[in-house]
Design a protein with these regions (language model features):
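Membrane-interfacial loop-to-helix junctions in multi-pass transporters
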Residues: 14-20, 101-107, 205-210, 233-251, ...
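Alpha-helical transmembrane segments of multi-pass membrane proteins
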Residues: 14-30, 57-60, 66, 242-256, ...
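Alpha-helical transmembrane segments of multipass membrane proteins
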Residues: 30, 41, 45-49, 110-115, ...
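Transmembrane helix-loop junctions in multi-pass membrane proteins
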Residues: 44-54, 118-121, 168-171, 220-229, ...
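Long, contiguous bundles of hydrophobic transmembrane helices that form the permeation core
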Residues: 59-206, 306-395, 423-432
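Helix-loop-helix junctions that connect adjacent transmembrane helices in secondary transporters/permeases
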Residues: 143, 152, 169-174, 185-256, ...
């Protein structure tokens, strides 16, 4: 909702369809939860649940997240080519460094949060420190800094604010809780402060409401034995075909994600399906990342598609159309978890750097092929059989079966030669 207010109208202004602009925004926004170094809240819960350092979670998520955003970029680029859109002149592009020079201090909470996470502190402690510093900057920093008329004094002030916040490290969580109580007292007597406290209490109430169905669902599934039955069913199916077990797990994540937020979805599915996948030989982090990914993809998947329907009023388009576009744009989010199960090197779980490089190479080619097949454009508009050709070639590259890589690469090379020759006949300038 925050970034969409800016990005969706901007894309529509440059000629993108409203449904496509909404789909891009929904896809990119959900991608923030899987992109290190600061991922979604589920990543912190995962770190605590499986007792794995947050750094390892980030390492496992890095390559898939990059591939996810490459897919989104590829779709936007190909759609621009299909629709004949052009970019704005370079002199009209905004300067991000000017904004950084003006408000550089606002990245202090993020920088400290990342430092603490990679320094080995727990996600809970790191998040609390980052949140405390954010509150200090919002409620005190902006007001006090205006009293300093020169830029050097302002810079010194912000450095002192950061150093003051860092002193909380040696006192632990008690100091942060004390600071929160102190600020609550200050806000109670400050002008407009009681409204702020009301917002904070409403946020806590929302968190409790989101947590309530988790306990109910897990309790019902555990007490009735359904959880054990479901896990056993996944294992039984996996003995004959692990692919079917993965599909079943994916469907459960998507269905649960249609009714509950991502965090409760992960907590439930990680307690049901992840242990079953682990018993079938899927590495620990990958089994949890699998349910994590599809819990996020549920917000892009119709008929519910919460992220798509959130973008609908901004784009002034049907949420269902935006959801269908988002599924097409985020195709990597649906495919990469399967590739990681069959090739753990994609998430840096075993294997050599050559193994990782090779699987990334295959994934990039598959992403490009699926992008062309979905949009219907490469160098020039693609015929229906070329789109089918690209889809089949990508499917062979993703499939973990004997000789599928060779077949997929052969089909890809043949398609590229064919399409290049056709594009050269239609528009020599395109291939010059």
């Amino acid at each position: 909702m925050t970034t969409g207010q800016f990005t969706i109208p901007l894309m529509k202004r440059f000629g993108y369809k409203a449904s496509f602009a909404g789909g891009v925004e929904a896809t990119a926004s959900m991608g923030g939860q899987i992109m290190p170094p600061v991922m979604g809240a589920v990543a912190f819960i995962m770190s605590e649940t499986i007792d794995v350092p947050y750094l390892e979670i980030c390492k496992a998520a890095a390559i898939p997240a990059i591939l996810y955003f490459i897919t989104a970029f590829m779709m936007v680029h190909l759609e621009a080519g299909r629709a004949g859109l052009v970019g704005i002149p370079k002199d009209e592009c905004p300067n991000p460094w000017a904004a950084m020079r003006l408000r550089w201090y606002l990245i202090l909470p993020l920088a400290i949060l990342v430092y603490l996470l990679f320094a080995g502190y727990t996600p809970l402690f790191s998040g609390m420190v980052g949140l405390a510093l954010t509150v200090v900057l919002i409620f005190f920093g902006a007001t006090l800094s205006r009293n300093f008329g020169t830029r050097p004094l302002q810079i010194i002030f912000w450095i002192l604010i950061g150093l003051a916040a860092s002193t909380f490290f040696q006192y632990g969580i008690q100091a942060i809780i004390g600071l929160a109580l102190l600020m609550a007292v200050v806000l109670w007597f400050a002008k407009g402060g009681r409204e702020t406290l009301k917002v904070a209490l409403n946020a806590l109430a929302d968190g409790a409401r989101h947590a309530l169905p988790v306990g109910v669902i897990i309790g019902v599934l555990t007490l009735t034995g359904t959880a054990t039955l479901f896990a056993g069913y996944i294992i039984d199916v996996g003995k004959n075909s692990i692919f079917l077990s993965l599909v079943l797990t994916m469907l459960v994540c998507l269905v649960l994600g249609m009714g509950i937020p991502t965090i409760p979805n992960y907590i439930i599915t990680s307690s049901l399906a992840a242990p079953a996948l682990l018993e079938l030989g899927v590495p620990l982090i990958i089994s949890h990342m699998f349910v994590f990914y599809f819990g996020i993809m549920a917000d892009l998947t119709p008929p519910v598609a919460l992220a798509a329907f959130a973008a609908a009023p901004i784009a002034k388009e049907s949420g269902m159309k935006i959801g269908l576009q988002a599924m097409r744009i985020a195709i990597a989010g649906f495919i990469i978890p399967y590739m990681a199960v069959y090739s753990p090197a994609l998430m840096l779980q075993g294997g050599t750097w050559w193994d990782t490089s090779y699987i990334v190479f295959k994934a990039l080619i598959a992403i490009a092929l699926w992008g062309g097949a979905a949009i219907g454009f490469w160098l020039v508009p693609m015929h229906w059989f070329e789109r089918l050709w690209a889809f089949v070639a990508a499917a062979f590259l993703v499939a973990a079966l004997p000789a599928t890589d060779e077949i997929g690469l052969g089909l890809t090379l043949a398609l590229e030669v064919w399409h290049w020759l056709r594009a050269r006949r239609l528009n020599p300038a395109t291939t010059a």
